[in-house]
């Protein structure tokens, strides 16, 4: 038994203070030297994670407290990264359930907690952000108990210990009105409540690979908890898949464990510890890394299937190559293969067309994160409209992914939200008061109706509403939905947009370009107010005359162009359209740029 090791995961809804809590736990436990400069948001290592305030990739860290090593695994808090969550929980012996003292139990809390309880973890409940003026700790504790009951928690799990805390201020206490001095009571409770796993150090080495990182120096680095035996540098090892088939064999060239957030090389890792090993180039997530004499794989949690796919190809617009550095199909393919290897929530396949690739993931955010990362790396590409991945039941009926949507809005907006969800085939499950003139509405709705809905929701609630979505499961196909009602305003030729032309076209619809923006034939430069595409000239300047009034030629006022994210633009696409992505620009376009070719294609009915 590894009595001096505790492996815990932190479960929390997005922005409930998880990463900040970990920051302060590490600082107060002495994980850093007194003179060491420490960044905020230590566990958010990616640029996008720090920008968006969400955890995308799970990552371990460790704290030494009272002669015990506490390995902390920060789990993603968003539904699209469920694949990460499931694997991370397999490394944990216990969990901290962090809940905002004002917002209370939220969808992501329910989603990850359900998986943790199913694996038999016994959480410590931490009511966080108690320094909020609108905190309602007692009500939130009651809601939490009700949530445990609804998730079929057993008696031991229902008898959870509770701490009241402020991660930002750096204190935790067993009582609401405790002394509020530091986080030491929480660290003590972790050691007391979380029981170390009973593991046998005498058996041959075996470890489930739960995370994978690409390292330019070490090659493939695999992270996992040693389930039995000890791992020693330079020992022969192999990887076997879930069927027990050998997929790789080699030597354990390097072994590391975490001290704080840093990897430190060690000679021996023992059962119960979370380590990083290198030496196998073909091993993957969910494989068992083990001694040569081990033949039984460690069971791995099934991973939820992807629900959405996009097609990515080389940038074929007339502006291709003017803004990016990575342009070829080979570069795109290699990048996507690497992503699929490192992120089991993403799957990769190649279309019949050699230069076209299909990427499937767990939702809009996962796909948007990938496209944003590639954009920052200098890629140019063309992306198709997202497609929902359907399944069939035993009778051959079509099933589609259904999401649970929880919204918190002012009462005056609730009818608008109900109406907008009805149009998306949403069904209202619950409506309740959450405070003065505040409502919480819960819906079930098909994923395909929710693409780009967040921006629409914020418009309907004038920026005051909060929306959360979670994958519920597959349900019966809810029937066809209306697509975009606005026709596209399409550029008739290549050139640069002119202010005079845009000014005169503004009355015909919303424009996506401004003065001097490059445009090309087939590029969507705006949306018409009614159905039906319209080809327009945005390069037409004012005719010169002999008699010119001084100061009037340039006196045009252009409506500012709406700034839209990748997800918003993808949600706008019809089946015959695409999105051009470059490091500097996002451009909507027709899949076939030439209008004559488009008409031929429409008549022939050839799929794009």
Predicted segments, located by residue:
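Structural and coupling elements of P-loop NTPases
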Residues: 1-608
